[in-house]
Design a protein with these regions (language model features):
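Hydrophobic packing positions in regular secondary-structure scaffolds
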Residues: 1-266
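Short leucine-rich amphipathic alpha-helices used at interfaces
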Residues: 8, 14, 19-20, 26-27, ...
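Extended alpha-helical regions
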Residues: 155-158, 435-443
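Ser/Thr-centric signal marking residues that sit
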Residues: 247, 429-432
């Protein structure tokens, strides 16, 4: 039965914490899935969360720790001694442990590592900390199953049992040569059905082996795993020696983080912000784009001021300013959002780019024509035929230009290695406001012969 967290249940937990009723927690909380326990701890104070956390067995503690909200986890770890942190890291996969250590100061890292009892685990974590966090090396884990090509099946099974003690999930066996270079894969099924004296070299798969290098960007890793539908991918160094693997759950977390970042950029927030971030940090993240919007507003005001005489002679021109700016901004954001989504999937070839530009241009022409006819009728009924022509022609041109600009800007940013998600936010809206107003008043002045 699926667990649903309620306020009433949290209230009971808090009461039982006050009473220190450990038997109740064992019966009603510790039996839950670790993801549900993590959801509960996210809602509690640090002391309440620690009380429940240390009632759980060590293996489940590791799962809960990685399921906690990032800010809650950081606050929780900050309340632990370096020895307690070291004990927790020994229960985690090396990549997760390295991620947690990476948030600490150099002095804290040294203290935690020095207090870890498992020297091999400590060495693996230190090794991972040497890689850039945005590369395959920073994403990989050191726990994996490997077999030498010269082993027999029965020896491989014995070795794999020993290796599997530290590996949470086994997807494939990586086959290496005497120099530890990756040469192929072996499925568990094929290993188990092979004769005990058969050599691994006779049964492993050596063709079409997909791997990544430690220096490959993490986004490239995600694209490769998506393309080949992989649940895990081996990681090799520049000599093709096997050094780790990346699993699907790591990539899913990466994709989620990138999606969150792009959404915040599109919303005009310049850095990643958590729900419980400080007021100063939230203000700092939002202010740059608000300033850009303000500057854009000043430019728009300047454009309007240049046509002050025309507005004085034809005041009804001012009525449709919001329509022009809002429509241009919406069209630009729609076009840029489609292009950004396409670029995120790796579609950045020249042919594909020209196709996008042509398609968005045609969409702009079609939508512009339909909207122009509609607005002409409305303006004609409530104002005059001349104003109807001004608004409809302007709207048509603005929609087409906005569609093209919304397509081009993400492509230009991507070409210059700038995150194209920037183009889906206030930047594109502000730019289209200025251009749209210029087009609108220029058409108005021409048709009214001012």
């Amino acid at each position: 039965m699926r667990f649903t967290l309620t306020k009433e249940f949290i209230d009971v937990i808090r009461q039982k914490y006050v009473e220190q009723d450990t038997s109740w927690f064992h019966e009603n909380v510790l039996e839950l899935h670790y993801a549900d326990i993590a959801e509960i701890l996210d809602q509690l104070t640090n002391d309440e969360a620690k009380f429940i956390y240390f009632l759980v067995d060590e293996d489940t503690q590791a799962d809960i720790l990685m399921e906690l909200d990032e800010d809650v986890r950081d606050r929780f770890l900050a309340s632990l001694t370096t020895k307690e942190i070291a004990d927790q890291l020994e229960n985690l996969d090396s990549d997760d442990a390295a991620d947690i250590l990476g948030e600490l100061t150099d002095e804290q890292i040294h203290e935690v590592i020095s207090q870890m009892e498992d020297d091999e685990a400590a060495e693996d974590i230190v090794d991972l900390l040497n890689y850039d966090e945005n590369t395959a090396g920073g994403l990989m884990q050191k726990e994996f199953i490997q077999a030498n090509m010269n082993w027999t099946v029965d020896r491989a099974i014995v070795e794999l049992r020993r290796q599997a003690e530290d590996v949470e999930k086994v997807y494939n066996i990586y086959v290496v040569d005497e120099l530890n270079k990756l040469i192929g894969l072996l499925s568990l099924k094929r290993l188990l059905f092979a004769s005990p004296k058969t050599q691994i070299s006779e049964i492993f798969q050596s063709k079409n082996i997909i791997s990544v290098k430690t220096s490959d960007p993490d986004e490239e890793v995600a694209k490769i795993m998506e393309k080949y539908d992989l649940v895990a991918i081996p990681v090799v160094d520049f000599q093709n020696k096997l050094v780790g693997r990346i699993t699907l759950d790591d990539v899913v977390n990466l994709i989620k983080e990138e999606a969150d970042k792009d959404f915040q950029l599109a919303s005009g927030i310049s850095e990643r912000i958590e729900l419980n971030a400080s007021v100063w940090r939230i203000s700092r993240a939002r202010l740059p784009w608000l300033l850009i919007g303000m500057v854009g507003g000043i430019f728009s005001a300047q454009v309007i001021s240049q046509y002050e005489n025309g507005i004085t002679l034809v005041p009804s021109l001012a009525f449709f300013i919001p329509l022009i700016t809002a429509t241009g901004g919406n069209v630009g954001v729609q076009s840029s959002a489609i292009v950004v989504q396409s670029l995120a999937k790796g579609n950045d070839q020249i042919g594909s780019i020209m196709q996008k530009l042509l398609k968005e241009g045609l969409v702009g022409l079609m939508n512009g024509a339909l909207l122009s006819v509609l607005i002409y009728g409305i303006a004609f009924i409530f104002a005059s035929s001349t104003l109807g022509f001004v608004v409809s022609i302007s709207l048509f041109v603005v929609v087409v230009f906005a569609a093209i600009i919304g397509t081009l800007i993400p492509l230009i940013l991507h070409k210059n290695n700038i995150d194209p998600a920037l183009a889906t936010g206030p930047f594109i809206t502000t730019l289209n406001d200025v251009i749209g107003l210029f087009i609108y008043f220029t058409v108005g002045m021409l048709l009214y012969q001012i």
